[in-house]
A protein has these predicted regions:
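Periplasmic-binding protein-like
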Residues: 1, 13-17, 57-62, 110-120, ...
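Extracellular/periplasmic periplasmic-binding protein-like sensory domains
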Residues: 127-172
Length: 172
């Protein structure tokens, strides 16, 4: 997003391979992308939660002031509510390392699923702390969770983790 005005004012074409936020290329005839957008990603993950887990209640946790996570959270919330689901949303401040209160809030809200579009550093902490709290429902997120950091955090726990991804097993 920050570089878009530079590309536009200099008439330099740019192609983003993983910039899922619609604002990145908005109103810029020189900026293109090759990936899906967050409105699609949020909707897919909301439908996945409803279809795969019969989720009626979702708990959404994103970082305050972070464009990617806040935007993706909004798209998920809108889609999940359109599907008839109920959502409890919270945001955590940058630098948070103790997510136990948020996990407890998810449990208290009767969450059938957590959707947490955030950086992998926070994701790993959310996963391990959810496991410690005994949270036994799926934790889902967007494309940033496609990382070995997530696999390492989940390893040895019973926490189910799912994320959207650009991977296509049928693509040669």
């Amino acid at each position: 997003i920050a570089a878009a005005p530079t590309f536009q004012s200099a008439s330099i074409p740019a192609i983003g391979c993983s910039c899922t936020n619609p604002a990145v290329t908005e109103a810029n005839p020189y900026y293109f992308r090759v990936c899906f957008l967050d409105p699609f990603q949020g909707s897919v993950m909301a439908n996945f939660a409803k279809d795969e887990f019969s989720a009626a209640n979702a708990y959404v946790l994103s970082m305050l002031g972070e464009d990617y996570g806040s935007g993706l959270a909004t798209y998920f919330v809108n889609a999940f509510e359109d599907l008839g689901g109920t959502v409890t949303s919270e945001q955590f401040p940058e630098g948070t390392s103790d997510f136990s209160a948020y996990i407890q809030n998810a449990i208290n809200a009767g969450a059938d699923v957590i959707f947490a579009p955030c950086a992998t550093t926070y994701a790993a902490q959310i996963i391990t702390q959810a496991a410690s709290a005994g949270f036994d429902k799926p934790i889902t997120a967007g494309d940033t969770w496609e990382s070995s950091v997530i696999l390492d955090a989940q390893k040895g726990t019973s926490v189910q983790v799912y994320c959207s991804t650009f991977f296509d097993e049928n693509d040669d």
